[in-house]
């Protein structure tokens, strides 16, 4: 569980949030997008870095995530969930327009922007699925459905035992 944080993780990254990647030289990377870019610079079989739209990813990591957290956890943030849901939907409207051009956010095939943003949209949709499904964003809904139905998503969401120091690493095969 996220509340059961290994001491080694907290020592490596005092902000104590997942993910944390400790490199062989001791350097620590503790932001999801930075870990993704680090990994893709080493192996990018689908050329995802070609779809690294930093501005779009940052907008969702910052503005959309802000509204998502307050919509999903209004008590924790002392927030009005409907106002934040509305603001999140406005950003999904921008995404809807973008998806009118391509099947994915930057091109026809998935890229880094899709993989970085999809978890936020998935969480937003899950708060009230019936409401989300009734919204006028059919391209976003289809985009999300395709990503969630992909074998890559199944492998990424595989449940594994909580990490502990000196445990064997869990390795994954190719993307699909």
Regions found by a protein language model. Name each.
Residues 56-149:
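GST-like fold's C-terminal all-alpha helical module
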Residues 1-90, 103:
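GST-like domain detector, emphasizing the conserved glutathione-binding G-site
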Residues 1-2, 137, 160-161:
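Residue-level "edge-of-site" marker
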Residues 157:
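Extracellular ligand-binding/catalytic regions of CAZymes and related secreted enzymes
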Residues 160-176:
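Acidic/histidine-enriched, glycine/proline-rich intrinsically disordered or flexible terminal extensions
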Residues 46-47, 129, 165-166:
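A short hydrophobic/aromatic micro-motif that marks alpha-helical segments and, especially, helix-coil
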């Amino acid at each position: 569980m996220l509340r059961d944080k290994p001491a080694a993780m907290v020592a490596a990254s005092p902000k104590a949030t997942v993910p944390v990647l400790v490199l062989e030289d001791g350097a620590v990377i503790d932001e999801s997008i930075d870990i993704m870019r680090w990994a893709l610079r080493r192996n990018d079989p689908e050329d995802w870095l070609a779809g690294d739209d930093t501005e779009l990813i940052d907008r969702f990591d910052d503005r959309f995530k802000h509204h998502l957290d307050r919509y999903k956890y209004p008590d924790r943030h002392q927030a009005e969930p409907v106002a934040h849901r509305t603001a999140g939907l406005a950003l999904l409207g921008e995404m809807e327009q973008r998806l009118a051009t391509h099947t994915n956010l930057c091109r026809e095939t998935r890229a880094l922007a899709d993989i970085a943003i999809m978890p936020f949209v998935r969480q937003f949709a899950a708060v009230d699925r019936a409401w989300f499904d009734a919204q006028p964003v059919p391209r976003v809904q289809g985009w999300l459905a395709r990503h969630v139905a992909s074998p890559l998503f199944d492998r990424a969401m595989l449940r594994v035992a909580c990490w502990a120091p000196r445990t064997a690493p869990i390795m994954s095969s190719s993307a699909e």
